[in-house]
Amino acid sequence: MKPKHILLAYSGGLDTSTALHFLKRHFDCRVTAYCANLGQKEDWERMKRRAAIAGADELVIEDLRETFIGDFVFPALKANASYERDYLLGTPLARPAIVKGLIEYARKHDVDCLSHGCTQKGNDQVRFEMAAKILAPDLPTVAPWRIWSLQSREDLFAYCQQHGIPVESRPDNLLSHDENLVHITTEGDYLESVANAFDWRDANWITPPTQAPDAIETITLGFRRGVPVSVDGAALGPVELVERLNEAGARNGVGFQDIIENRINGLKVRGVFENPALTILHAAHRKLEKITLGRDVERLRNLVSDDYGDIVYRGLWFSDERLCLQALIDESQKYVSGDVKVQLYKGSCTPCAVESEQSLYSRELVTLHAGRAISGEDATGFLNTLGLRIGIEAARAGNTGAGA
């Protein structure tokens, strides 16, 4: 059935501007462009003009920054979530935030079809459509990349030139970027050859470590139940806190990653990520957990962290499995409150001191000096008990103590 009102997730870039024009021509129906403000640096007036030229009946811009950080980034931070123990999930966390806003708008404005500008080769089509299937299974999705004849970014640029759509991409600069409040990515062009080193002239946020200040900068992060709430003693909201850490990390060369990851479809892809705030937050959060989580709780949390990151990466933020893991994670964080000092210096991020009223660390019990010492009698009893199982296993193996 031909749609009457398509709602397109719109970034204003080459892909979605081409998609907008294509949808309007191909379906000849109302097309609303929906842009979620997740903290990307954008000329909103220019975006409005571009969307109008590309054929949008309306451009909607919604500020989702607080929702993005508070409801998506911070819950994942509590899990220390990453993908393949490397990628800090800046894009996979953004996609469900966008889809949630998109569908909430769709429900209020008689939208009968969703659309996106994700390519048929990448991960984002999965993230968009899995989230949409969970939140709005009744709304179909149309993906221009899967039905038009265009095959490359060069083709898209030529299409926009042909139809007078102003885009910032150039045929001689085909790097692709995705930006939000917690990271900016750089992909494509010369980076598609893993033999090529990243050219620091293409960095967007981060000062090259060799050009960063020669003095260490120390900041103090405050956490409450696993959630960051302050910087240097000043209580901050989620957006302002992340912005402050981005500035501090970027000027000190912190948060650069050059990653080769395994896509959802199994193919390997290379991306460069600049995520100063996330890098600082992850380091500080892990340090605080070291004194506030019991050994076995920490081990259990670590067991699910990889699964959590994999679930988010595969576009299943709204799935039952993510919600189950989140309940466990949230319970693990009830004592993760305190302050962490972090040193930033020429690309390094080093937690150097930590304090918490919920600390399980007892200096008195572990000191090398006089204190509440564990007696020799206590230690002997502990070792005898600890060795019972090992002794039984050794006897079974025939280890009589006579040598090999």
Swiss-Prot record:
<dbReference type="InterPro" id="IPR018223">
    <property type="entry name" value="Arginosuc_synth_CS"/>
</dbReference>
<comment type="pathway">
    <text>Amino-acid biosynthesis; L-arginine biosynthesis; L-arginine from L-ornithine and carbamoyl phosphate: step 2/3.</text>
</comment>
<feature type="binding site">
    <location>
        <position position="119"/>
    </location>
    <ligand>
        <name>L-aspartate</name>
    </ligand>
</feature>
<dbReference type="InterPro" id="IPR024074">
    <property type="entry name" value="AS_cat/multimer_dom_body"/>
</dbReference>
<keyword id="KW-0963">Cytoplasm</keyword>
<feature type="binding site">
    <location>
        <position position="261"/>
    </location>
    <ligand>
        <name>L-citrulline</name>
    </ligand>
</feature>
<dbReference type="GO" id="GO:0006526">
    <property type="term" value="P:L-arginine biosynthetic process"/>
</dbReference>
<feature type="binding site">
    <location>
        <position position="36"/>
    </location>
    <ligand>
        <name>ATP</name>
    </ligand>
</feature>
<dbReference type="GO" id="GO:0005737">
    <property type="term" value="C:cytoplasm"/>
</dbReference>
<comment type="subunit">
    <text>Homotetramer.</text>
</comment>
<feature type="binding site">
    <location>
        <position position="123"/>
    </location>
    <ligand>
        <name>L-citrulline</name>
    </ligand>
</feature>
<protein>
    <recommendedName>
        <fullName>Argininosuccinate synthase</fullName>
        <ecNumber>6.3.4.5</ecNumber>
    </recommendedName>
</protein>
<dbReference type="GO" id="GO:0004055">
    <property type="term" value="F:argininosuccinate synthase activity"/>
</dbReference>
<feature type="binding site">
    <location>
        <position position="117"/>
    </location>
    <ligand>
        <name>ATP</name>
    </ligand>
</feature>
<keyword id="KW-0028">Amino-acid biosynthesis</keyword>
<dbReference type="GO" id="GO:0000053">
    <property type="term" value="P:argininosuccinate metabolic process"/>
</dbReference>
<keyword id="KW-0436">Ligase</keyword>
<dbReference type="GO" id="GO:0005524">
    <property type="term" value="F:ATP binding"/>
</dbReference>
<dbReference type="GO" id="GO:0000050">
    <property type="term" value="P:urea cycle"/>
</dbReference>
<dbReference type="Pfam" id="PF00764">
    <property type="entry name" value="Arginosuc_synth"/>
</dbReference>
<dbReference type="InterPro" id="IPR014729">
    <property type="entry name" value="Rossmann-like_a/b/a_fold"/>
</dbReference>
<keyword id="KW-0055">Arginine biosynthesis</keyword>
<feature type="binding site">
    <location>
        <position position="127"/>
    </location>
    <ligand>
        <name>L-citrulline</name>
    </ligand>
</feature>
<keyword id="KW-0547">Nucleotide-binding</keyword>
<feature type="binding site">
    <location>
        <position position="123"/>
    </location>
    <ligand>
        <name>L-aspartate</name>
    </ligand>
</feature>
<dbReference type="InterPro" id="IPR023434">
    <property type="entry name" value="Arginosuc_synth_type_1_subfam"/>
</dbReference>
<feature type="binding site">
    <location>
        <position position="176"/>
    </location>
    <ligand>
        <name>L-citrulline</name>
    </ligand>
</feature>
<dbReference type="InterPro" id="IPR001518">
    <property type="entry name" value="Arginosuc_synth"/>
</dbReference>
<feature type="binding site">
    <location>
        <position position="87"/>
    </location>
    <ligand>
        <name>L-citrulline</name>
    </ligand>
</feature>
<feature type="binding site">
    <location>
        <begin position="9"/>
        <end position="17"/>
    </location>
    <ligand>
        <name>ATP</name>
    </ligand>
</feature>
<dbReference type="InterPro" id="IPR048268">
    <property type="entry name" value="Arginosuc_syn_C"/>
</dbReference>
<comment type="similarity">
    <text>Belongs to the argininosuccinate synthase family. Type 1 subfamily.</text>
</comment>
<feature type="binding site">
    <location>
        <position position="124"/>
    </location>
    <ligand>
        <name>L-aspartate</name>
    </ligand>
</feature>
<dbReference type="Pfam" id="PF20979">
    <property type="entry name" value="Arginosuc_syn_C"/>
</dbReference>
<keyword id="KW-0067">ATP-binding</keyword>
<dbReference type="InterPro" id="IPR048267">
    <property type="entry name" value="Arginosuc_syn_N"/>
</dbReference>
